[in-house]
Amino acid sequence: MFRGATLVNLDSKGRLSVPTRYREQLLENAAGQMVCTIDIHHPCLLLYPLPEWEIIEQKLSRLSSMNPVERRVQRLLLGHASECQMDGAGRLLIAPVLRQHAGLTKEVMLVGQFNKFELWDETTWHQQVKEDIDAEQLATGDLSERLQDLSL
């Protein structure tokens, strides 16, 4: 399980160094194999260990290619999916087209989200967090049943 937000830097080749606390888990559970794709709702990337991505692919394969909305989701997620292998120094190379989608240049937020990471440009991440907090403060109590049952 991945949690927390960590500032990491991309090097000049577009590689990010995976924080040490995740490396062993990624090596053990995925042999360091990851899949990166775009987030279709936000200007960030989604980074999955290969076994987790294979579950997503199975779900995508069950969508109808005859349904325009389902086909669009398949096209966006699978069409942008890029395999990346963690090297001996714990780095992952993020494809240029993916970095461009999320506006990633130097400082990147690696955000744990249970079974995957989100990769955000640092400035965009802080803006998104502010927007999310502001939206919650303005919310009128329209919580789903699942959120109502969540006790923090």
From Swiss-Prot:
One of its GO terms (molecular function) is DNA-binding transcription factor activity. PROSITE patterns: SPOVT_ABRB. It is found in: Cytoplasm, Nucleoid. Its main location: cytoplasm. InterPro entries: MraZ (IPR003444), MraZ_C (IPR035644), MraZ_dom (IPR020603), MraZ_N (IPR035642), MraZ_sf (IPR038619), SpoVT-AbrB_dom (IPR007159), SpoVT-AbrB_sf (IPR037914). The keyword Transcription regulation applies. SUPFAM superfamilies: AbrB/MazE/MraZ-like. Keywords: Cytoplasm, DNA-binding, Repeat, Repressor, Transcription, Transcription regulation. Residues 5-52, 81-124 form the SpoVT-AbrB domain. GO terms for cellular component: cytoplasm; nucleoid. Coiled coil: none annotated. Transmembrane segments: none annotated. GO terms for biological process: negative regulation of DNA-templated transcription initiation. Negatively regulates its own expression and that of the subsequent genes in the proximal part of the division and cell wall (dcw) gene cluster. Acts by binding directly to DNA. May also regulate the expression of genes outside the dcw cluster. Belongs to the MraZ family. Forms oligomers. This is Transcriptional regulator MraZ. It comes from Escherichia coli O139:H28 (strain E24377A / ETEC). The gene is mraZ.
